[in-house]
């Protein structure tokens, strides 16, 4: 396999994720698109690590670190969405005006 294939896949996933972030009004869908972007970044790190130097595992270590951060972000994000849904009964981003002033 060539590195171009992995980079093409990662860029397609990243573009789909950014499109979803910019156009979606559902907060759960926004979190899913953010996870898609993070997975595209992981593909890039692993592909570059594999094709540049076979001996070192720096790309894999960074990818595991990003997966850990993404899992924590997803858990906290979904907990916040669930709490806001219980109070507001909606998951629409436009209705998240929780600041009073």
Curated annotation (Swiss-Prot):
Q: Which GO terms describe its molecular function?
A: oxidoreductase activity, acting on NAD(P)H, quinone or similar compound as acceptor; quinone binding
Which branch of life, at top level?
Eukaryota
| Protein name per its UniProtKB record | NAD(P)H-quinone oxidoreductase subunit 4L, chloroplastic
Q: How does it assemble?
A: NDH is composed of at least 16 different subunits, 5 of which are encoded in the nucleus.
Q: What does this protein do?
A: NDH shuttles electrons from NAD(P)H:plastoquinone, via FMN and iron-sulfur (Fe-S) centers, to quinones in the photosynthetic chain and possibly in a chloroplast respiratory chain. The immediate electron acceptor for the enzyme in this species is believed to be plastoquinone. Couples the redox reaction to proton translocation, and thus conserves the redox energy in a proton gradient.
Q: What's the chief localization of this chain? A: plastid
Gene (UniProt): ndhE
PANTHER family cross-referenced by the UniProt entry? NADH-UBIQUINONE OXIDOREDUCTASE CHAIN 4L, NADH-UBIQUINONE OXIDOREDUCTASE SUBUNIT ND4L
Which NCBIfam families does the entry link to?
A: PRK05715.1-2, PRK05715.1-3, PRK05715.1-4, PRK05715.1-5
Provide the E.C. number(s) assigned to this enzyme. 7.1.1.-
Pfam families from the UniProt entry: Oxidored_q2 (PF00420)
Alphabetized, the UniProt keywords read: Chloroplast, Membrane, NAD, NADP, Plastid, Plastoquinone, Quinone, Thylakoid, Translocase, Transmembrane, Transmembrane helix, Transport
Catalytic reaction equation(s): a plastoquinone + NADH + (n+1) H(+)(in) = a plastoquinol + NAD(+) + n H(+)(out); a plastoquinone + NADPH + (n+1) H(+)(in) = a plastoquinol + NADP(+) + n H(+)(out)
Query: What GO cellular component entries does it have?
Result: chloroplast thylakoid membrane; NADH dehydrogenase complex
Keyword GTP-binding among record annotations: no
| Transmembrane annotation, as ranges | 2-22, 32-52, 61-81
Family per similarity comment: Belongs to the complex I subunit 4L family.
The UniProt record lists the keyword Glycosyltransferase: no
Compartments, record wording? Plastid, Chloroplast thylakoid membrane
List the GO biological process terms: ATP synthesis coupled electron transport; photosynthesis, light reaction
């Amino acid at each position: 396999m060539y590195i171009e294939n992995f980079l093409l896949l990662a860029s397609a996933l990243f573009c789909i994720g950014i499109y979803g972030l910019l156009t979606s009004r559902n907060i759960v869908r926004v979190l899913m698109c953010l996870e898609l972007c993070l997975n595209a970044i992981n593909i890039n790190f692993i592909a570059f690590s594999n094709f540049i130097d076979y001996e070192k595992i720096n790309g894999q270590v960074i990818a595991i670190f990003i997966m850990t951060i993404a899992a924590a972000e997803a858990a906290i994000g979904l907990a916040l969405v669930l709490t806001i849904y219980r109070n507001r009964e909606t998951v629409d981003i436009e209705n998240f005006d929780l600041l009073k002033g």
